[in-house]
Structures are given as structure tokens and as C-alpha cells.
């Protein structure tokens, strides 16, 4: 009995060898499939960090200050931090701004930097060229946000540096540090996508506290834009109430928005200030206005940002009284918007010696236009195929079959009405298919048209009219842009052409009240003037 039972148990025992082999093969197939769908196609590009840094990871418990090196490395990997940590950094830095004067007073040595515009990876190159913030005094002239796709990283990193080095790193306000421009351009959308609207609101409150100007070494007035007909002395700047959204006119607006005349130093008339027709607000100021202000306030020069420069900087005509350039423009965003192909520059001033250091752009991760995700981007492709299938399905039923079916089913006028409803639906789906097809084949034209049209939206009816409608709308928008100084061609071949095409985006956006326009001063675009003091160091290749 015992042997019989053992034999039966032996016969009933399953064969585990084949089962184990099958499971192992299945696991290998799953791993292969998983690797196929998760492995990076471009292996040199790292996958963005998904984990957000906590407050404890961002802040050093011993010092109570942000670990800016940790933030830098995390942001380089496209990482983000928890909202609580982001808000704490911004609010702590805002308290420092509020305790600073409207016009800072900074002693040399100092390194002056121009526009950053959300180009975080180029900001890393800037610190590599200019020196560590731990050992180098920095003054930034504003425009940290908009246009580029890493604006919030620039803000959080610079604000963290300010907390760590409050007496050696200084930040001024630019014209883009306001609600009006950040809503119109990209910063608000970026904050909502990467963090939340609350983070955006905290940033706006912080921007309201930024100083407006700096007196460097008692010799140089540093400001984002330039002069104002309402500002005659440095005391006029000190008296400005800066804790607010910048107005559309007045001295605060002028400090952020004004520009030198295009024929600065070679003016055809003696007018010191004229309406800024390029910006749509504020003023152009002349060489005479600049020299008068410098002489009246016993200054050597004005250092400002606000305008892209092919070489990253520009030194204007020398003052007859001092023999020093009366005006210097610094721009620190290389290959601006990924199309200008310009160099960036920073200005180092030490021991009464001014040194310009140039640098080129650095590689950065790619974002689809307007922070679009891949699903939104691919919607026209998917939509085209889905609507094609629907149209084919509906077209299976011919008009004769439709009439015969409706005659049998409905009595009187009900059948005719039903047929008309079905025909309307077929035509509507066909129209939708046409729109998706246009989007599919003309995606580049749509992007160009969105870029030209105010607010980044398509003109009404452009898609429904098909390719002809898109081309017609594009020609109309191009002609409108040309009236604002844009080149009619859309293949950008030079820095000057890029600047002309982008001129429409340099204006103050609509829906903001501006004072009555004065007679604009029309001047030709000047050729590059010979700089009285060439840079001592050439560009460093990235």
C-alpha cells in the first residue's frame, strides 16, 4: 500500500522544469520590452530627474541657508524642488530686497552681467567665465525671465545665491520682471507647468521689491534700460517708489524701458529725448542727454543691458569731458532665442581697469514651443487619422441608401429632417478632418503664424480655409510685422535680421495704457561702431 501511494504521488507531481523555463523566458521578454520602451534613444542625454528636492534637502540645517551647489546640480539635470522649498527661497530673498535701497551703492571690484532671459545653462557658463559667486562680486542688470524655457531655474538659483551671499551678489529689476510681460510671454505659463500659480504670484511679489539702479564705485550708474527726462540727479532715482508693478510711463518705466538712439553720437538734431517707437513706450535718449547727465552727477559712464548685441557688448561714443565711453551695453544671453547666434559678455571692473569677457552658448535640453507636451504636439497627426476613419465609415452609406432607409423608417417631413441632420454631421466631420490635415501638413506655418500674431493665437477661420487660408493669413501677419520694422523673409541668416524679425516682441505688449505718442524719431540702423576699449580676453568656446 505504501509503495502504491508513493507511485501515485510521483506520477501526479508536476514537471517544474518546463514551467521555470517558460517563466524565465517571459521575464526576459518583459525586460527586453521594458528596455526597448524606456531606454533613451539619444544615450548622451540623461533622463530628467523625477524626484523633487525637499526643504531639508535644499536647506542646510547648520547655516539655515540654501545649498546652492545642490540646487545647481539638480537643475542641470532638469530636476525640480518641492513647492514649499521654492516659495521659501523666493520669500527669504524678497526680505533681503526690501531692506535694500532703490539705488544700491557698490564698490569695485565687481562683475556686471546683462540679460539672462531664462537661459539657465548659459548662466552656468557665465559663472564659469566670471568666477565663483563665493569669491566674486556680481551685479545683474535684470531680465532673468521670459523668452527662454528655464526661467524659474534662473530665479531660484540666483535668489538662493543672494541668500548665501547678500553683500556680494546684487540683482536689479529689468522690464520683464513684472506681471504684464510675464503673462504675455512665457514665465507665467512655465511656473504653472513646472510648479503652480502660487509660485508665480510669489515671484511677482519678489520682483516688486527688486532695486532699480546701482551706483558702482561712485563712477558708474548701472541700470537696465537707461535715462529719463524726469530724472536729473541720482537723488531722483532714490526717491522713486519701486514697490509696485512698473507703470506704462514715468521715471520708473524709463529706467526699465528706455534705449539710446540708434544713431547715438551722430544725431541729426539737438533733441535729447524722443518717443521710443521701437518699444511703444518710454524714450530714446541722445548722446547729449547722456553727457549732460554724467557731467551734472559727476559720473564716468552709464552701464545698461536691455538690448541684444552681436558681440555681447557695445561701447558708445566717448564723453568729450572724460574720454571714456559715455554709455556701455552688456548682454549676457548667448545665441539669444536659439536664433540670434550672438556672443554674450560680462564686464569685470577692478583697479580702475575694465575688462570685457565674452562667451558662447552652451547645449541645453529641448522644449517644444510654448512648453507643449508630446501628446499635444502629436494631436494633429492622431486627429487626422481618426477623422479619416470616421469619414470613411460614414461614406459607406451612399445618398441613395440614406434616402431609401429614411423613407422606410420615417413618415412625412421627419425623414427629410433626419437625412439633413446626418448630412450635416458628415460634412462637419469632413471639415474637422480637413482642419487636422492642414495642421498635420502645415505645422510649421501654424507655428510661424502663432509667433507673428499677438497673443500667440491663430487668426479666426485660418484653419477652416485650409492651406490657402493659412498662407493668406501668414502673408497678412507678415505685412503687419513688416510695418513694425520686420524683414519679410523668414529664413534668419544674420544677427541683424534676427533682431529685425524679433522687433515686434521688443514692444510693450498691448492692453496696457500708454501716454499719447510723441513724434517718433526715425533713424537708420547704424553699423557697428569701433569700440574705444576692445576686450582684453577673447570669447571662450563652450
From Swiss-Prot:
What cofactor(s) does the depicted protein rely on? Fe(3+); Zn(2+)
The question of whether Metal-binding is a record keyword is answered with: yes
Its subunit composition reads: Forms a complex composed of a calmodulin-dependent catalytic subunit tax-6 (also known as calcineurin A) and a regulatory Ca(2+)-binding subunit cnb-1 (also known as calcineurin B). In response to an increase in Ca(2+) intracellular levels, forms a complex composed of tax-6, cnb-1 and cmd-1/calmodulin. Interacts with cmd-1/calmodulin in a Ca(2+)-dependent manner. Interacts (via catalytic domain) with rcan-1; the interaction is calcium-dependent and inhibits tax-6 catalytic activity. Interacts with exp-1; the interaction is calcium and cnb-1-independent. Interacts with arrd-17.
Specify the species. Caenorhabditis elegans
Annotated region (Calmodulin-binding) at 418-432
Q: What is known of its domains?
A: The autoinhibitory domain prevents access to the catalytic site.
State the activity regulation. Answer: Activated by Ca(2+)-bound calmodulin following an increase in intracellular Ca(2+). At low Ca(2+) concentrations, the catalytic subunit (also known as calcineurin A) is inactive and is bound to the regulatory subunit (also known as calcineurin B) in which only two high-affinity binding sites are occupied by Ca(2+).
Tissue specificity remark:
Expressed in head and tail neurons, ventral nerve cord, body wall and vulva muscles, sperm and spermatheca. Expressed in hypodermal seam cells. Expressed in intestinal and anal depressor muscles. In male, expressed in CEM, HOB and ray RnB neurons. Isoform a: Expressed in thermosensory ADF neurons, chemosensory ASE, AWA and AWC neurons, osmosensory ASH neurons and AIY and AIZ interneurons. Expressed in body wall, vulva and pharyngeal muscles.
Q: Where is this region: Calcineurin B binding?
A: 366-394
Superkingdom as given in the UniProt entry: Eukaryota
Q: EC number(s) on record?
A: 3.1.3.16
Any idea where this protein resides? Perikaryon; Cell projection, Cilium; Cytoplasm
The sequence motif named SAPNY motif is recorded at 332-336
Query: What Pfam families does UniProt report for this protein, alphabetically?
Result: Metallophos
Disrupted gene: resulting phenotype? Shorter body length and reduced serotinin-induced egg laying as compared to wild-type. Reduced calcium responses in AFD neurons upon a temperature increase from 16 to 20 degrees Celsius as compared to wild-type. At 17 degrees Celsius displays thermophilic behavior, preferentially migrating towards hotter regions. RNAi-mediated knockdown results in an increase in lifespan. Also causes nuclear exclusion of crtc-1.
Question: Could you identify this protein by its name?
Answer: Serine/threonine-protein phosphatase 2B catalytic subunit
State where Zn(2+) binds. Answer: 143, 175, 224, 306
Q: In what ranges is there compositional bias, type Polar residues?
A: 1-11
